[in-house]
């Protein structure tokens, strides 16, 4: 038997019409499979540009998300917290401070704008899908359980609703839930104004659960510190932001022990406004009151009007300074400064009143009256220890001693037991009516203005030195 040629057999098979048709069918089937595979790949992946790099990511179908949400909410009771009766729900909190201010010292409150975030695990919201996280808006908030967090020292709080409610909800496939919202809060801050306006304060923002005690809900900080925005845009005006700190504590009440989270914002007051409005004007008024010491003591209208004007001005300044403060019962640093300035101004007016009283109410000398009545006494007046007042000068004889004094330093107090009381004012009431006693303290009337020119500025400078060192450095 002659063996067949393989090449001839292959050629014969190719020429067979049935075999050719069979090969064409297989080729069409193969091409169809390739086309279907390509279309399926295009449907399951979509292209997006990120930094000019093409990446293929899975498409999320709207129907898939709807099915997941419907499955999660089926039989879900939003009135019950996660793990109820098993273990406490741990709430991880975080805060971003958008702005602080203004601070209202009269009402003792401040305004703060924050983004508040809470994260917890709810096993009832676990789902199996290629979608790792569901990014939802505020419409889903009312359908799941949300912590009943409230701000304990809040006087007023507003949630932002423009253009839509500023709330966000995220649900991960492992049951983790993130809930954030934006709030503007008017919080209470008890200001201690003893050192006003050189005071510093630590204003708290406290929050906790309203109805769940520590056995039900535990709050924890997600990060060790709270993040803040650009402080240059904050409307603090009279204050400077110096830092913050966050704490966790347990507060015991009649309804249970609650975990309270607190953020303390440290603020220090700027003195520029009060220096211009109060301190400098008060200092200038005090200095202005010293001008009367250089005015002639006989210029009664000038010195009196100057003293009264400065006193009234100080009263007005003290009233204006108090308008920016609450009606506290204790004395502030500014009250002390204004009060001392008022005392200095009032003392300057009292000094002139004292001087004018003893100058204008001088008594004529008895020896002088006798000389006017008896011409013989005037002729032999050099033999007796009397006072002889002349138009330009006066000769005072004390114990056979002669002293020449100017006319403007003479006053008509009579001498006691031969002593010269005419040029002195005794600090004791019985000086002009009683006997002379050795060791009395005397103040020279004519030199009161001279003494005041030195005493008042020196005392005021010493007060300022002690005042500023005590409040700024101690």
From Swiss-Prot:
Cytoplasmic side of membrane: 296-301, 359-450
Report the leader peptide range.
1-38
GO cellular component, alphabetical, reads: axon; chloride channel complex; dendrite membrane; GABA-A receptor complex; GABA-ergic synapse; plasma membrane; postsynapse; postsynaptic specialization membrane
Q: Which PROSITE patterns match?
A: NEUROTR_ION_CHANNEL
For biological process, the GO terms are:
adult behavior; cellular response to histamine; chloride transmembrane transport; gamma-aminobutyric acid signaling pathway; inhibitory synapse assembly; post-embryonic development; synaptic transmission, GABAergic
Where do the record's region annotations for Insertion, similar to human gamma-2 sequence which is proposed to be caused by alternative splicing lie? 376-383
Task: Report the Pfam families cross-referenced here.
Answer: Neur_chan_LBD (PF02931), Neur_chan_memb (PF02932)
Reaction(s) the record says it catalyses: chloride(in) = chloride(out)
State the compartments where it is located: Postsynaptic cell membrane; Cell membrane
> Which InterPro entries does this UniProt record tie to the protein?
GABAA/Glycine_rcpt, GABBAg2_rcpt, GABRG-1/4, Neur_chan_lig-bd, Neur_chan_lig-bd_sf, Neur_channel, Neuro-gated_channel_TM_sf, Neuro_actylchol_rec
- Principal localisation: membrane
Disulfide feature: 189-203
Q: How does it sit in the membrane?
A: Multi-pass membrane protein
Q: Which UniProt keywords apply?
A: Cell membrane, Chloride, Chloride channel, Disulfide bond, Glycoprotein, Ion channel, Ion transport, Membrane, Postsynaptic cell membrane, Signal, Synapse, Transmembrane, Transmembrane helix, Transport
Question: According to the UniProt entry, how is activity regulated?
Answer: Allosterically activated by benzodiazepines. Activated by pentobarbital. Inhibited by the antagonist bicuculline. Inhibited by zinc ions.
Residues carrying a glycan: 51, 128, 246, 266
Q: Which residues lie on this side of the membrane: Extracellular?
A: 39-274, 322-333, 472-474
Annotated GO MF terms? chloride channel activity; GABA-A receptor activity; GABA-gated chloride ion channel activity; transmitter-gated monoatomic ion channel activity involved in regulation of postsynaptic membrane potential
The record describes its post-translational modification as:
Glycosylated.
Name the family: Belongs to the ligand-gated ion channel (TC 1.A.9) family. Gamma-aminobutyric acid receptor (TC 1.A.9.5) subfamily. GABRG2 sub-subfamily.
Function, as annotated, reads:
Gamma subunit of the heteropentameric ligand-gated chloride channel gated by gamma-aminobutyric acid (GABA), a major inhibitory neurotransmitter in the brain. GABA-gated chloride channels, also named GABA(A) receptors (GABAAR), consist of five subunits arranged around a central pore and contain GABA active binding site(s) located at the alpha and beta subunit interface(s). When activated by GABA, GABAARs selectively allow the flow of chloride anions across the cell membrane down their electrochemical gradient.
Q: What is known of its domains?
A: The extracellular domain contributes to synaptic contact formation.
Subunit composition and interactions: Heteropentamer, formed by a combination of alpha (GABRA1-6), beta (GABRB1-3), gamma (GABRG1-3), delta (GABRD), epsilon (GABRE), rho (GABRR1-3), pi (GABRP) and theta (GABRQ) chains, each subunit exhibiting distinct physiological and pharmacological properties.
Q: Which named protein is this?
A: Gamma-aminobutyric acid receptor subunit gamma-2
């Amino acid at each position: 038997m002659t063996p067949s040629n393989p090449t001839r057999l292959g050629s014969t098979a190719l020429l067979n019409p049935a075999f050719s048709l069979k090969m064409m069918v297989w080729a069409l089937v193969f091409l169809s499979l390739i086309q279907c595979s390509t279309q399926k790949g295009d449907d399951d992946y979509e292209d997006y540009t990120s930094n000019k790099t093409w990446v293929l990511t899975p498409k999320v179908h709207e129907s898939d998300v709807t099915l997941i949400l419907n499955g999660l909410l089926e039989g879900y009771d939003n009135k019950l917290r996660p793990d109820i009766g098993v273990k406490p729900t741990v709430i991880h909190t975080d805060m971003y401070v958008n702005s602080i201010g203004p601070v209202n010292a009269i009402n003792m409150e401040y305004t703060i704008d924050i983004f508040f975030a809470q994260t917890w695990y709810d096993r009832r919201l676990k789902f199996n899908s290629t979608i790792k996280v569901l990014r939802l808006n505020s419409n889903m908030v009312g359908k799941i359980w949300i912590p009943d967090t409230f701000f304990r020292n809040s006087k007023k709080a507003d949630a932002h609703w423009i253009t839509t409610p500023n709330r966000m909800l995220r649900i991960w496939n492992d049951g983790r839930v993130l809930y954030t919202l934006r709030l503007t809060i008017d919080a209470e801050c008890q200001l201690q104004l003893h050192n006003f306006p050189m005071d510093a304060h630590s204003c708290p923002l406290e929050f906790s659960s309203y109805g769940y005690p520590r056995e039900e809900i535990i709050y924890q900080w997600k990060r060790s510190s709270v993040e803040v925005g650009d402080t240059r845009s904050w409307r603090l005006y009279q204050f400077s932001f110096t830092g913050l700190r966050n704490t966790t504590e347990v507060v015991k009440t009649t309804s249970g022990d609650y975990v309270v989270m607190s953020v303390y914002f440290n603020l220090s007051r700027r003195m520029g406004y009060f220096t211009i409005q109060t301190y400098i004007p008060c200092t200038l008024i005090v200095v202005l009151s010293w001008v009367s010491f250089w005015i002639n003591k006989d210029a009664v209208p000038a010195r009196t009007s100057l003293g009264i004007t400065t006193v009234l001005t100080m009263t007005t300044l003290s009233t204006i300074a108090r308008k920016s403060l609450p009606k506290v019962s204790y004395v502030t640093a500014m009250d002390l400064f204004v009060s001392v300035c008022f005392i200095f101004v009032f003392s300057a007016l009292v000094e002139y009143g004292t001087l004018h009283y003893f100058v204008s109410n001088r008594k004529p000398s008895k020896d002088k009256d006798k000389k006017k009545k008896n011409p013989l006494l005037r002729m032999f007046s050099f033999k007796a220890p009397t006072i002889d007042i002349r138009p330009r000068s006066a000769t005072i004889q004390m114990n056979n001693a002669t002293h020449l004094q100017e006319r403007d330093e003479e006053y008509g107090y009579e001498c006691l037991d031969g002593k010269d009381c005419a040029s002195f004012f005794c600090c004791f009431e019985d000086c002009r009516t009683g006997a002379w006693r050795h060791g009395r303290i005397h103040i020279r009337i004519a030199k009161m203005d001279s003494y005041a020119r030195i005493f008042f500025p020196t005392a005021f400078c010493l007060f300022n030195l002690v005042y500023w060192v005590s409040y700024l450095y101690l």
